[in-house]
From Swiss-Prot:
Protein name, UniProt field: Undecaprenyl-diphosphatase
Location, primary (coarse class): membrane
Any one GO cellular component localisation term in the record: plasma membrane
GO molecular function terms listed in the Swiss-Prot or TrEMBL record: undecaprenyl-diphosphatase activity
The protein's enzyme class: hydrolase
UniProt-listed Enzyme Commission number(s): 3.6.1.27
One Pfam family, short name: BacA
UniProt GO BP: cell wall organization; peptidoglycan biosynthetic process; regulation of cell shape; response to antibiotic
Length: 273
């Protein structure tokens, strides 16, 4: 196996893991970074593998919580509420994705759309953070979330179907806008990532499994492990960060990154294939 290809697969896995749970759009980063380093492996199969690695990082980090929920479903009120909330939050984006996913990929999966959504998302984060600085959050614990709160987060997640929006960004900011405390919204976004990404991965596997070859196994394992490790680091670091600070630095980063994408695209450094 060529060392340079291995290095590129490792770097792509790290990018996925580090960006999946930050409100900065992992999709935008993967496309730009993949273009810049010239990574052209079996794209969809590799993408499935690194997404699965990232989501397993959340499962591992919250393994005790998920274990308690699995053992408590049907018997424990908190566990039942937790599962119900995840199901409610899952439905809007799942339904809209099935109905309009193909059209969105055809018409919005381009540099301009991603760049615009990165910039608009950055401005939205600035506004939400300013609003929460004077509006006291009503909910400060995941177990205190009501079904209506989960529904509002689920509705916000629909916007993440547009490339460049960021799934974590839309759910966290949607939760904060609804009156949920920053860290609580972040944790629920992590939990919601599990059913969303598992469902998306399963759907993609059914569509693309025939493109899998034994030749891809090595690169897939490298990307998977890299995404898992970097995802675990990102989850832990983000929780520590939002316990003391806000998301404003990520807002400015999004704006700069969005402008950079347009510059790179116009200059011919990246393509969208």
């Amino acid at each position: 196996m060529d060392f340079l290809i291995v290095l590129k697969a490792l770097m792509m896995g790290l990018v996925e893991g580090f960006t999946e749970f930050l409100p900065i759009s992992s999709t935008g980063h993967l496309i730009v970074f993949g273009n810049l380093i010239g990574f052209h492996s079996n794209h969809k199969v590799f993408e499935i593998a690194i997404q699965l690695g990232a989501v397993l990082a959340v499962v591992f980090e919250y393994r005790q919580r998920f274990s308690n929920v699995l053992h408590g479903v049907g018997k424990d009120r908190k566990a039942n509420r937790f599962v119900l909330n995840l199901a409610i939050a899952f439905i809007p984006a799942a339904v809209m994705g099935l109905l309009f996913g193909k059209q969105i990929k055809e018409h919005l999966f381009n540099p301009l759309s991603v760049a615009v959504m990165l910039v608009l998302g950055g401005l939205f984060i600035l506004w939400v953070e300013k609003r929460q600085s004077w509006a006291e959050p009503k909910i400060a614990d995941v177990d205190a979330l009501r079904p209506i709160d989960a529904l509002m987060i689920g509705v916000a997640q629909v916007f993440a179907l547009i490339p460049g929006t960021s799934r974590s960004g839309s759910t966290i900011m949607g939760g904060m806008l609804w009156g949920i405390e920053r860290k609580t919204a972040t944790e629920f976004s992590f939990f919601l990532a599990v059913p969303m990404m598992v469902a998306a991965t399963a759907y993609d596997v059914l569509k693309h499994y025939r493109f899998f070859t034994l030749h891809d196994v090595g690169l897939i394992l490298i990307g998977f492990v890299a995404a898992f490790v970097s995802g675990l680091v990102a989850v832990k670091a983000l929780l520590r960060f939002v316990s003391k600070k806000n998301y404003i630095p990520f807002a400015y980063y999004r704006i700069v990154f969005g402008i950079a994408i347009i510059i790179l695209w116009l200059s011919g450094w990246i393509s969208w294939e």
